[in-house]
Amino acid sequence: NFTKGSGSSVYIADIDKYTDSQVFPGHVWDGFVDDGNGVNHIDVKNCNIFNFGSGAIVINGTDVHLDNNHIKNIGGTALYLRGGDLETLTPSNNEILNNNIHHVGYLQKSYVPAIGMHGVGIYVAYNDLYDAPHCIFNYHGNDHVIEYNKIHDAVKECLDMDAIYTRNEYVPQWRGSVIKNNYIYNIGIYPVGEYKKQLNVSAIRTDNYGHALQIYNNVFA
């Protein structure tokens, strides 16, 4: 129920809105990508997505649900999801739930998170996210919720970075996001012979005057 676009990418416009229990072995480009015009009512669930040299899933749209997928061995960002209207604050109703995402950014190394988000009202919960040289989350926009995720073994090869990262000094209207009830551990530790601790690493950072956020009930270990 899908067709392949150029470079063997799977274009969202060709998926018939729903992909369930498929296996997508990788190649050098992105995995799922939208057609550039935005899409809506997309479900990708119960899929195994692995060995992509760039991103695994790149979608700009609304009512997008990425649920219970196993994504691994990704050269860049595993999931990049955009959606919602930043002018009217209309939420995207996009969700990223119950995914196992690991071993990301093995080629590009920095600013290629497990999950990148931009827009309004993206909900991310109950994911197991780990093994990244840089950040796990890099998000921008309004009214996102990041909760009940297990985040570990990240920022292994870089300094001055964090497991969950945002910055909004140039766009102070980006506000209202909530980060709560996450379990975050083994950040900035990379085993090279003896364990090495990276410098200036945190679990959560709101960089350069990041503000108007709620951060509570997270566990750090």
For each feature predicted by the language model, list its residue ranges:
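Right-handed parallel beta-helix
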Residues: 1-4, 25, 37-54, 63-76, ...
